Amino acid sequence: MKTAFRQQLPRLTGGYDHYLEFGVDTRTQQAFWLSRQVLSRPWHDAAQRRLTVSLCQPSGPSAVLLQDTDARSAYPSLPMCWTEEQYNSPSGSFLSSEDDQLQGRIFTASSMATWRLRASSPVEPESILWPSGGLRCQPTQWLGELDASGHSISGLFVGTRIQFWGRIAPIGMALLSVPRLGGDAQVQLTAMGQFAGRAGALSERLNGSVGVLRVGHETYHFDRWWPAGALASARLDAYRWMATLFSATHRLELVADGGNPRITPWQGLVDHTPEGLRQLLRVTAYATIHVRLFARGSDAPLQEWRNESAFLMTLAGDTPNLPLGPVATP
């Protein structure tokens, strides 16, 4: 399990490698997500690392989000595997990830966060590759506690490990993961879509979507990543994603809706691209989703699922003005 989540940062062309872990307590619906990202610019040996932690709940105070950043002057200082990472920054923040023991601390100017978690997974990771990058995912459970800005959550969290990487940051993107699709612990879905333009007709035609669906002991790889606008259109905005994914034998239709941001807890995370641009990622752990599985060429669904708590991250390319810090209004 350790060797599967290896660093994938391109050395010559530059790019990004994003490793994300999230979990939801099925009893209280409290959730956390922990993001670790490495960026490098073309033909530069230096790399920038970002560590972000968030706690959220479906009602009451929506969320806490903290971030720390540091720079590495050479690639040899980066870990070979995400699951064996050691992170230390001048601010005093640190992270230790080894032997499925995950612990760390973030210091910022106004607050701090600490966490101690133990991870376990009954299945091996699955990967999908395309010419400019790839996606890797693994259903995982965490047992432990997290504390941020005086807010504490603890228990057994059910979620996913996700890694995605590439040479060029997409203008539009959606990342979706459901650890218990339809409330069934034997069904998990992780999917990703990338758009070549802002929301609109051009973006809908120039999009590619991939995903991994586990149903019991059977795994479906929807790996037809090339733009498929002639077969089925996709829709992406700040809070919703609709797409059709294809494999050689099946297709998957999904509609993910994060709802009204005034009601559903959303977070806005100011992110950076390898090219030095700034963008806004919107994240919620409480999106609703409707999924249907078809045989290729058939209009009769083989199976159908609905879920009220899915992890959804969107990048809609509509953020002309962003604050200086990591947190923004979603």
Predicted regions and their residues:
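Structured soluble/peripheral alpha/beta segments that form catalytic or ligand/cofactor-binding pockets
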Residues: 1-330
